Amino acid sequence: MKIYFSGIGGVGIGPLAQIAHYAGHEVTGSDRESSLLTENLKKQGISFDIGSQNGTFLKRSNETKPIDWFVYTAALPQNHPELVEARNLGLKTAKRDELLSKIISDKKLKLIAIAGTHGKTSTTALTTWIFKKLNIPISYSIGSTISFGDSGFYNKDSDFFVYECDEFDRNFLHFNPFLSVITSVDYDHPDTYPTKEDYANAFKEFIEKSENTVAWEDQMPSIYLGQRNVNLLQCESDINPDITLPGEHNRKNATLVVAGLTDVGIINKNNYADAISAVNSFPGADRRFERLLPNLYTDYGHHPIEIKATLNMAKEIAQKNNQDIVLVYQPHQNIRQHNIKKDYSNQFLNASKIYWLPTYLSREDPSLTILTPNELTENIINKENIIFAELNDELWVKLQEDLNHGALVVGMGAGSIDKWLRQKS
């Protein structure tokens, strides 16, 4: 089967292209610009086009050999030239998870789904790492680059597939998981779910589609229906004391994974010690409190709960060296800011200095006014520590001064801040 991936270098589409390649399909595609993923795809012998994405390469590829599937991300506009051309050519068009669901079904794999508002990527990477360290063949897809393998991989000897099941655009409802690990349920993606009830009901449906589920009880009161095979852990008593990862949120997510894998028999008394050793040696995933330089970190977090969790983890590290914490924060999506503005309050208390950037705009509702930094920060308790800034050379000079004075600097956001920090460092 020949599959064309539009946006082949993205963190959602790129790993799936790798999986399709390893599963024996012919893979090609396009993207606007190169990335770490496109470099990895090139090394694997996959051909694709970098440039305009105006439909010309797609048409030429289809003339060379007919394309069976045109796969795209839910973020692709319906009037995108490639999507329009694919429909003009009469190609089967599908979003990412429709194809992945087919591959999982065709290969008769048991899906281990990592879902939830926060921590999906790190937890998916951790679960994959555990399988690898236990020498259990595994197929997987991770929404980030990792240091211990490709972002997406199909192993013909595996019985299981580990996947980051994203709730955006209701993508996770394409699947019927063998095991679902739900890290958290905090209202997000207002462009998909107009109300909190819509969001909760989607997770309710997801649980109903899962054979086994593990989650924290305090995250589930509004969506738990009392289905069988749902393991609800207690926050106060059930955090695994053998897990020593930095960051309480990481320890909680790892506890869920170990509990879930134990529930379905993958972890048992014979390999428990090795599994815990794997957890505690986990190297992390890119853009998840990833160190770029000594004392300079980049993190994907862009929700108040994620901000607080990451700064708590930064505090654990900074306290050992008596360091100040400097945060560079880029809010993500104006439509999201309209929904979470009221929640910005005490999440920033661990930062002695906060450089607040303009909101990164993506998939916006044109009817909404753009919230200013002043409007977004009016309820923050320590707003006297906030400095409004732009991603420019002046900011980088200030960050270098902070680093030279021994501060721990964290850049947070899902937009352009990560790329900017990498270029500067």
Model-predicted segments: where are they?
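NAD(P)-binding Rossmann-fold cofactor-contacting core
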Residues: 25-40
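Conserved N-terminal Rossmann-fold NAD(P)-binding element of oxidoreductases
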Residues: 3-8, 412
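P-loop/Walker A phosphate-binding loop and immediately adjacent motor/lid segment at beta-alpha junctions
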Residues: 91, 209-211, 228, 311-321, ...
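Nucleotide phosphate-binding/pyrophosphate-handling subdomain across enzymes
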Residues: 2, 12, 19, 108, ...
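A glycine-rich beta-strand to alpha-helix segment
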Residues: 67, 393-425
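C-terminal helical cap/extension that packs against the catalytic core
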Residues: 44, 345-405
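Conserved beta-strand positions in the Rossmann-like core of class I SAM-dependent methyltransferases
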Residues: 28-29, 139, 355
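Phosphate-binding loop of NTP-binding sites
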Residues: 19-25, 42, 55-65, 74, ...
